[in-house]
């Protein structure tokens, strides 16, 4: 059975790329067409790449490896933390500190400091032997460490591979992984460089539902790998969300062939393209040049009924 269906990818807006003026020519082979100034990603290729990445992550974890989940943009923060915690893997969803991989020995010392501060009762002025001001300074230090390092507190060595949402934003993490020859599994939007990624998944890295779906798929691969590692059943696999269950129940016979992908994409309406443009989180060209990413609306949330019917 396929890891994910074509219908799930379409409904999550995985096929929406960036505006045509913001693209990387190296991504041309992963693009299906262009419509209304928006690139449409070839989901038929995405399906095969998802299966390949899924198998790699599963085998890596089954042989004792670990996967670090990385995504600091607003659209990815919640799903990165939720899915990583579900399968007990390290994650970074707030800010990437330079040297988290290449200088892990120093980072590990900061983790030890965070654990040391956990033993302090910041409200016990009399028993601590410290003044209120000193306790306040320590509390602020602890809060800062928890925010940046809380997701990797149990990590004792560099990960076996990394899952990254938006390789452009997380370019420091990509560079560090490449220096250490750590395989990179990532979503490739139409403005990304595929040469930086070992296991590519062409797709939308701006829409919340797209990021959530693909991150859940990777987490499911980790869960299955853990099951193989321990030689037993695992209950870590997350049940489908209600909207995903409705999709599958409403169309059990949906085929994932290339002809369907072509027909569905060509039948999409202009409002969908507008949603895709909004999903980029770049309302203005100036914002795009500045690199700031606002929280994007979910692509496909309000897709016209006729688009669903075409699928």
Curated annotation (Swiss-Prot):
Region of interest (Disordered), ranges: 251-311
Keywords in alphabetical order: Ribonucleoprotein, Ribosomal protein
Biased composition (Low complexity): 269-311
Superkingdom of the source species: Bacteria
Entry GO CC: cytosolic small ribosomal subunit
GO molecular function: structural constituent of ribosome
SUPFAM superfamilies listed in its UniProt record: Ribosomal protein S2 (SSF52313)
A Pfam family matched in the record: Ribosomal_S2
Alphabetized InterPro entries for the sequence: Ribosomal_uS2, Ribosomal_uS2_bac/mit/plastid, Ribosomal_uS2_CS, Ribosomal_uS2_flav_dom_sf
Biological-process GO terms, alphabetical: translation
Protein family: Belongs to the universal ribosomal protein uS2 family.
Protein name per Swiss-Prot or TrEMBL: Small ribosomal subunit protein uS2
Taxonomic classification: Bacteria, Bacillati, Actinomycetota, Actinomycetes, Kineosporiales
């Amino acid at each position: 059975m396929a890891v994910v269906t074509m219908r799930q990818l379409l409904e999550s807006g995985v096929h929406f790329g960036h505006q045509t003026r913001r693209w990387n020519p190296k991504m041309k082979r992963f693009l299906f067409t262009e419509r209304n100034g928006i690139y449409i990603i070839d989901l038929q290729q995405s399906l095969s790449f998802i299966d390949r990445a899924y198998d790699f992550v599963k085998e890596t974890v089954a042989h004792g490896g670990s996967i670090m989940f990385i995504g600091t943009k607003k659209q990815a923060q919640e799903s990165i933390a939720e899915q990583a915690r579900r399968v007990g893997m390290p994650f970074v969803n707030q800010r990437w500190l330079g040297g988290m991989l290449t200088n892990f020995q120093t980072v590990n010392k900061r983790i030890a400091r965070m654990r040391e501060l956990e033993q302090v009762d910041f409200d016990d002025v009399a028993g601590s032997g410290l003044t209120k001001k000193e306790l306040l300074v320590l509390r602020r230090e602890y809060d800062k460490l928890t925010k940046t390092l809380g997701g990797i507190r149990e990590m004792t060595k560099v990960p076996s591979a990394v899952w990254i949402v938006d390789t452009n934003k997380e370019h420091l993490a990509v560079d560090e992984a490449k220096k250490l020859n750590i395989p990179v599994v990532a979503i490739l939007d139409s403005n990304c460089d595929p040469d930086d990624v070992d296991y590519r998944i062409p797709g939308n890295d701006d829409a919340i539902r797209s990021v959530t779906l693909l991150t859940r798929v990777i987490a499911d691969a980790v869960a299955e790998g853990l099951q193989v590692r321990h030689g037993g059943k695992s209950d870590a696999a997350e049940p489908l969300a209600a909207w995903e269950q409705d999709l599958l129940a409403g169309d059990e016979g949906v085929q994932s062939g290339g002809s369907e992908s072509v027909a569905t994409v060509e039948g999409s309406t202009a409002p969908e393209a507008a949603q895709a443009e909004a999903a980029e989180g770049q309302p203005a060209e100036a914002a795009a040049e500045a690199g700031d990413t606002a929280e994007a609306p979910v692509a496909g949330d309000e897709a016209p009924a006729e688009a669903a019917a075409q699928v």
